[in-house]
């Protein structure tokens, strides 16, 4: 209706059904197939709306994904290790203060450091328990910046295949995946874009050159 009535110059639409479905059901299954068919129908409805509005021939369409997904078998909670080594202070089950804290981004996590005097000690601890924490990569702030990630953190860790990181600071370091939070669900994201299936980028319209295949892109 918006397209037909207002004929906007620019319209940005986020179809989140596939993302939600993969978080809850995994990468490839009947539910994912249903979500893909729903997305296909909605895209068809949008294209048809431009035809009904008489703007189809003047409209450029860009269809893209913002990330892929990887499966999650277990959730790893590095804050349990940090707490046991005095980096996190807890009272009555709540964090009262911390020298360092791991904040989950799914398959990666950002490490916020309040006490820079312990930064070297923290790095050594993570290196020592790298295998137990299922860490594949430890990036410094500068290395993360070179990859296009900025933020109020000192390090970023990325997990091995099949795990995501959690925020829990008590209990077991290793827990089962949990669909109550998308970061810890049976499939999630937060990994380097070189892993897994890469999101699509499809463009067509009067200002788009046809028949061109772009192997990869970089937004930096």
Positions of predicted regions on the chain:
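Short catalytic/ligand-binding loop motif for oxyanion handling, primarily in non-cytosolic enzymes
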Residues: 19-23, 70-73, 78-79, 165-167
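Short secondary-structure boundary/capping segments
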Residues: 26-30, 76-81, 171-174
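Metal-dependent active-site segment of extracytoplasmic phospho-/sulfohydrolases and closely related
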Residues: 38-82, 156, 201
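A long, amphipathic alpha-helix that forms part
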Residues: 2-11, 18-61, 121-128
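Histidine-centered active-site/metal-ligand motif
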Residues: 14, 20-24, 67, 182-183, ...
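Acidic/histidine-rich catalytic neighborhood
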Residues: 58, 65-114
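Active-site neighborhoods of enzymes that stabilize oxyanions during catalysis
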Residues: 97-220
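Short, well-ordered beta-to-alpha junction loops that form the rim of enzyme active sites
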Residues: 13-17, 65, 159-162
């Amino acid at each position: 209706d918006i397209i037909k009535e207002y004929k906007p110059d620019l319209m940005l639409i986020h179809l989140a059904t596939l993302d939600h479905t993969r978080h809850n059901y995994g990468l490839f299954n009947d539910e994912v197939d249903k979500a893909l068919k729903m997305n296909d129908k909605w895209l068809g409805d949008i294209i048809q709306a431009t035809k009904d509005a008489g703007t189809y021939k003047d409209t450029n369409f860009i269809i893209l994904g913002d990330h892929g997904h990887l499966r999650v078998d277990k959730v790893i909670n590095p804050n349990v290790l940090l707490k046991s080594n005095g980096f996190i202070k807890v009272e009555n089950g709540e964090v009262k203060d911390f020298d360092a804290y791991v904040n989950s981004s799914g398959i990666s996590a950002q490490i916020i450091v309040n006490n820079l005097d312990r930064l070297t000690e923290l790095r050594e601890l993570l290196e020592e328990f790298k295998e137990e924490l299922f860490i594949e990569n430890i990036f410094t702030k500068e290395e993360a910046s070179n990859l296009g990630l900025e933020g109020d953190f000192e390090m970023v860790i990325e997990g091995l295949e099949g795990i995501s990181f959690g925020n829990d600071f008590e209990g077991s370091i290793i827990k089962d995946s949990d669909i109550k939070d998308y970061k810890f669900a049976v499939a999630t994201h937060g990994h380097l874009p070189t892993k897994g299936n890469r999101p699509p980028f499809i463009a067509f319209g009067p200002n788009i050159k046809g028949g061109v295949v772009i192997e990869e892109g970089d937004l930096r």
